[in-house]
Amino acid sequence: MLTVDDILEHTGEFNFFQKQTFFLLALLSAAFTPIYVGIVFLGFIPDHRCRSPGVAELSQRCGWSLAEELNYTVPGPGPAGQAFPRQCRRYEVDWNQSTLGCVDPLAGLAANSSHLPLGPCRYGWVYDTPGSSIVTEFDLVCANSWLLDLFQSAVNVGFFIGSVGIGYIADRFGRKLCLLLTILINAVSGVLMAISPTYTWMLVFRLIQGLVSKAGWMIGYILITEFVGLSYRRTVGIFYQVAFTFGLLVLAGVAYALPHWRWLQFTVTLPNFCFLFYYWCVPESPRWLISQNKNAKAMSIIKHIAKKNGKSLPASLQSLRPDEEVGEKLKPSFLDLVRTPQIRKHTLILMYNWFTSAVLYQGLVMHMGLAGSNLYLDFFYSALVEFPAALLILLTIDRLGRRHPWAASNVVAGAACLASVFIPEDPHWLRITVLCLGRMGITMAYEMVCLVNAELYPTFIRNLGVLVCSSMCDIGGIITPFLVYRLTDIWHELPLVVFAVVGLIAGGLVLLLPETKGKTLPETIEEAETMRRPRKNKEKIIYLQVKKLDIPPN
């Protein structure tokens, strides 16, 4: 019997075909960034104030500067900084009356401007920005600010539902079909969102994008890890995520060039239409085909891979035939993720680690609050932090295995959060350095959980297992804003204490998982259950059988 990994040793483990396929799927990974973090630019909140009829005309007549206009016509902050009248309240004054002067125009109406009545922003807002965002177009500020939270929550809800549902479809009907379907829906809904006339329609199409986009990203990850040989599996998995980081850098540049949200949304959606050509470029996974007892199709793709790689299959491999003793096709089931003790343990630990990675990754970004007024540069610099994390993984994963670097990265992230609690604000650079160390640690953990998750499940439920477990990071993404902002109201450093506890627990749980370094991907439930023990060559229905007489002598 030969496994797919054995066959790839003959067809090429990472030759021209795999490199071409990796490049194509890496583009898909980079294109996912506008959906995952696009809210930074699509939902940008500029300085704003209530629109008051007559103020613009009075300012023009008097020749005021912007600072003078704000000083004369906009309320200042309330007592002890409570509330925000500058953004959400306006003077109940008729600015069109001719008695108003150009120097302190409110002096004749009240001895002190603080005694003037204030009212809500009945006429909308004025935004100090040359561009536009969904906030400025739909006035998602003040009493409506929660609608921006709902917009981001909707995409995370979509991630959660889509990861589970589409994960099942991908294992049931194939990786390629599901990938193309998610690309098409993502492209169409992205364009429709860009031309949405109302907030409600925009929210609906963003939810649809969430339903398919993350699932498509994960299917691309599964595909590339199933196409390459054992020795290259971890490398392409890491660089697939590095492609996401490159997408962050590109997004910053595109957003800078296109400050209007509709044009930005339309531009970042266009590549998805190009990805539909993958129908002719990316074949179905041979591993999935074999797991579904479609060995003829699998053999055809294997020959195609060998041809693209300039390899010739040995005569023994030309006579491959399916095991005739058992021909039942394996069908994925959610119960397979918890039915047996070891896989159940793997599932629970992986779900917790996905949750932890999302909470710490997004939480540290929110809590750190990058200094500076240039949104685009801040975003660009924060993305650069992720490259050293990938480098450290590449340097350690083959030498130390998966478990120990993964556990250490969680521990470092948790310890950095805890240490930063006791570091004073001055010197500021020291505190930022420690928090960046935590960001690097949790970035490593995020990349490691993707890699190991795919290695712990048998082929016929691998896609389902990855997508179900990774759905917990969507739950983390939904609650993290509330976790950060509500706990900060109690004590500014309290979120960091929570992050530390969560991260340290995650590091300990990782040590309960089996080491996957140097092991072939499990093909059956039994193999996944016995990963801690040395693997024996057993005949499995998802292997390809070779007649002993056809095997050339050693």
From Swiss-Prot:
Disulfide bonds: none
Catalytic activity, as annotated: (R)-noradrenaline(out) = (R)-noradrenaline(in); (R)-adrenaline(out) = (R)-adrenaline(in); serotonin(out) = serotonin(in); dopamine(out) = dopamine(in)
Any Gene Ontology CC annotation: apical plasma membrane
Cytoplasmic side: 1-21, 171-176, 231-237, 284-347, 398-403, 453-463, 515-554
Keyword field contains Signal: no
One annotated GO biological process: organic cation transport
A single MF term (Gene Ontology): neurotransmitter transmembrane transporter activity
Segments crossing the lipid bilayer: 22-42, 150-170, 177-197, 210-230, 238-258, 263-283, 348-368, 377-397, 404-424, 432-452, 464-484, 494-514
Short sequence motif named Proline-rich sequence, residue ranges: 283-287
Keyword terms, alphabetized: Cell membrane, Glycoprotein, Ion transport, Membrane, Transmembrane, Transmembrane helix, Transport
Physiological role: Electrogenic voltage-dependent transporter that mediates the transport of a variety of organic cations such as endogenous bioactive amines, cationic drugs and xenobiotics. Functions as a Na(+)-independent, bidirectional uniporter. Cation cellular uptake or release is driven by the electrochemical potential, i.e. membrane potential and concentration gradient. However, may also engage electroneutral cation exchange when saturating concentrations of cation substrates are reached.
Note: Mediates the renal secretion of many clinically used cationic drugs. Transports drugs such as diabetes treatment medicine metformin and neurotoxins 1-methyl-4-phenylpyridinium (MPP(+)), famotidine, ranitidine, amantadine, acriflavine, amiloride, memantine, cimetidine, cisplatin, oxaliplatin, platinum-based drugs cisplatin and oxaliplatin, 3'-azido-3'-deoxythymidine (AZT) and tetraethylammonium (TEA). Mediates the bidirectional transport of MPP(+). Metformin competitively inhibits OCT1-mediated thiamine uptake, leading to a decrease in hepatic steatosis.
Record remark on domains: Contains one proline-rich sequence (Pro-Glu-Ser-Pro-Arg) that may be involved in tyrosine-protein kinase YES1 binding and is required for the activation of substrate transport.
NCBIfam families the record matches: 2A0119
Record protein name field: Solute carrier family 22 member 2
